[in-house]
Amino acid sequence: QDGDPVKGEAVFKKCMACHRIGPDAKNLVGPVLTGVVGRQAGVAPGFSYSALNHAAGEAGLHWTAENIMAYLPDPNAFLRKFVTDAGNPEAAKGSTKMVFKLPNEQERKDVVAYLKTFSN
């Protein structure tokens, strides 16, 4: 089943402890997520990323729907694997600031559908 952006908006409330989305959104503990689907990792303007996030972006990580789905259950494990698989295992250390995990697959599909409504 595909994601439902209306349900995704409700799921996104869990994310709002650290993130904002929309035309007037500002960075908080986490970066603004307006336009995140399709964006390169680690490049939201004005946000100070962890070294691990920077390494993933430099290794070519883009936030496709598939990558977001794979990231949300365990952000650190996903980023470390991406950086290692890209041939830079020495950069696959440290951690992202994102400690929240979203293990439920349908909730992830719904929140990705919601994020897509704010992306080109």
From Swiss-Prot:
Transmembrane segments: none annotated. Binds 1 heme c group covalently per subunit. InterPro entries: Cyt_c-like_dom (IPR009056), Cyt_c-like_dom_sf (IPR036909), Cyt_c_1A/1B (IPR002327). The modification Pyrrolidone carboxylic acid is found at Q1. GO terms for molecular function: electron transfer activity; heme binding; metal ion binding. Signal peptide: none annotated. One of its GO terms (biological process) is photosynthesis. It comes from the Bacteria. SUPFAM superfamilies: Cytochrome c. Keywords: Electron transport, Heme, Iron, Metal-binding, Photosynthesis, Pyrrolidone carboxylic acid, Transport. Heme c binds at C15, C18, H19, M98. Belongs to the cytochrome c family. Cytochrome c2 is found mainly in purple, non-sulfur, photosynthetic bacteria where it functions as the electron donor to the oxidized bacteriochlorophyll in the photophosphorylation pathway. However, it may also have a role in the respiratory chain and is found in some non-photosynthetic bacteria. This is Cytochrome c2 iso-1. It comes from Rhodospirillum centenum (Rhodocista centenaria). The lineage of its organism: Bacteria, Pseudomonadati, Pseudomonadota, Alphaproteobacteria, Rhodospirillales.
